[in-house]
Amino acid sequence: MKHSLYAYTELSASEFKESLINDFEGTLEILRQGVSTFEKIDTRPDFFCLQRDFQLNLAELFGKIETRWNENTLNAPLKAFFGNSSLSNNGHVLPNIVLFDDRVNVDQALLIYGALKNKVTYVQGPPGTGKTQTIFNTILSAFFAKKTILISTNNNRPLDGIVEKLSFSYDNHKIPFPFLRLGNINKIEETTLQIREAFQIEDEENDLSVNELEILRKKVLSKNREAVIALTNFQKRRVAEENLVFLEKVEKMGARSSIIKKQKPLLQKQIQEIPYVSEKDIISHFVSLKEDKDALKYLYCSSLKHLAKLHSPKYDVLHEIVLIEDPRERAMKFNSFLSCNENLELLLDVFPLIFTTNISASRLGDGDVFFDLLIMDEAGQADIAHSLIPISRAKSLLLVGDEDQLNPVITLDENTNEDLKKEFQISDTYDYLANSILSTMKAADKVTNRVLLRNHYRCGKRIINFNNQYFYHNKLVVSPSLEEGNVSFIDSDNHVRTPVKNQNYEEAKNVVSYCKKNDISDCAIITPFVNQAKLINDLLIKNGVKEVKAATIHSVQGAEKNTIIIATGVSSFTSPRTIKWLNSHGEIANVAVSRAKKKLVVFGDEEKLKNTKTGDSVWNELIRYCKSKGTVEVIPSENDSLTIGKSNGSITEDEFYETIEQIVSIKKRLKVVRNLPIKELFEEYPNSQMEFDSVIYERGVLGGFKPCFAFEFDGGEHYSDAKRIESDKRKMKICEQHGIKLIRLPNSFSKDYEFLKKLIEGYKEDDTHEQLTLF
């Protein structure tokens, strides 16, 4: 299981390392502030092997880009990156568009048109606008156009969503669509098995020759020819109308020039000459692939033709690799095979469609093999440097993303970033910390057209209208078929301080209470803070709520649920700095709200958010919106049924016993006994039912062992249960009478090797045997 350091502290990796070396105990205390109630810091010594799948040499990539710049051989997408783009496209030939079904609108069709026609296309895809389906249709269209296609993203989740759609059948046969899913070593292990299976597929059922297959392809494309012509005219008319509106606005502002006088009548004439066609009519002209037997037959036969090439002797080396039984060896050999340009070209001849992350694209040859089309999804989350890996390998680029959603996660010190900008005279356009690849290229490239996907199909109207007003300036067109949707706000005033920062106990308790009372199932709980998510999940588990989980926003990007609960995590103890950070990341609210299909519930401390002066606050606006468009609710406290701080029982004791055994194993005069009844330790208490969690004995000078330490681990019940409190007092008195140290520790210290080691060493140095100060 992987855990990010940033989930527990705001220190960078380098700062944490330096702090750990210089102040071990102080650094542990910083970590303790970040762990949840049921987590523990483990300082027991361990040996482990740290290994990366591969080393990425960005300097080599940038050197190659610089060489291309000097030789004036940059590919079109890189020219656009440097602001040297032009309006040139892929000629006057109209692109051929293939749509899987009729779930498409004109904006989506224009996106596909631009991707196949232009060298570079920028797409803003707000939430719920059918972005994934449109990319899927673009892939189908590019496949019918016989293009090699690279689909890349910053992480795996968007890729998985697209790959899931590539499942077709023809005449009761599954179509073995020729694509590969690359990525980390585990993905490669799976992919090589897929290739092994592909070697076993025969072409016997494909009764079409190469020429017959080409005739069938052209037949399929001809069915959508009329629709493509109508779409072309629609776009020309729309551009002319927009330009005319712009000129008229300039005129109203008092501008007078010969250019305006000359251009206005030309635009008016152009608009009159282009036949008007409605968006509905354009879409109705398209023949959907899933209803077209010819199209499905082409997909089936063409896929078989691609895979049949594997039987050529040219692929013998690849065949030997995929037959290797050891998964890791097989994957490593395949990666080595893939790094050779000639091998990559062979592979693309069989599998013209490749899915990979931006970083893993570095394995695709040495960068001199170019894909016909690169589709980069979630480009608003992709950092500049790693995005250039796939961009440098493409002839054409479709860049899809949304700058109003999540930004790249970049671990670079701000001061270092500013120093680098000054040293190398880097403009704000290429500011590594402040930009994604999408924002940089749109700022640098003033020529290329932008496409906005405007039609929203996911959220209830009341829900998405907030995003539409606050983030998209009412440009979104909400589908009339959507439900109204419900929004509500639940004020969670909090005066309970938890030992962990960025937690609101009352809010967490109310969220769980709401889930139980309303029997919530198809739901996600979203919070900006890892610690609040941990607290909510702890309470959900304790209260038997298994269907719902809490997570931060990055975990739910791209997902959708009937109900979304937003837990802001803000309380009266939240620092102004944290709230300022929260307000500066409005994209969290945009993404969180737009995950909800039917119901949005916002929990928060309205008073705290309202009274903290940090400028414009999307969270205050969201609360106001929910109150004006929906309901306001207060959930009564249910402290009797929701408790935190319970002891973990045997789990904690197991962890402590393992830790303490390591310590006493290197101190031969010590031994440890677990769960020792008091009646066995002291004969004068034969009827006592009490026991110590652990007792440490020390060997005397003349032999024999004498008890010196007794350990007890305390959960919340040790401070709230009257019987437990009385029992603890009796244990303390017994220990005092017999000269034994009774050490009470919170559960979180059960795995803290260094703390317990120093505690025992401190005892041996303490001749007076006075009680040690633990906190």
Segments predicted by a language model, with ranges:
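Conserved P-loop NTPase motor core of helicases/translocases
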Residues: 85, 91-96, 157-367, 408-428, ...
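Conserved motor-coupling elements within RecA-like helicase/translocase cores
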Residues: 343-348, 550-564, 571-574
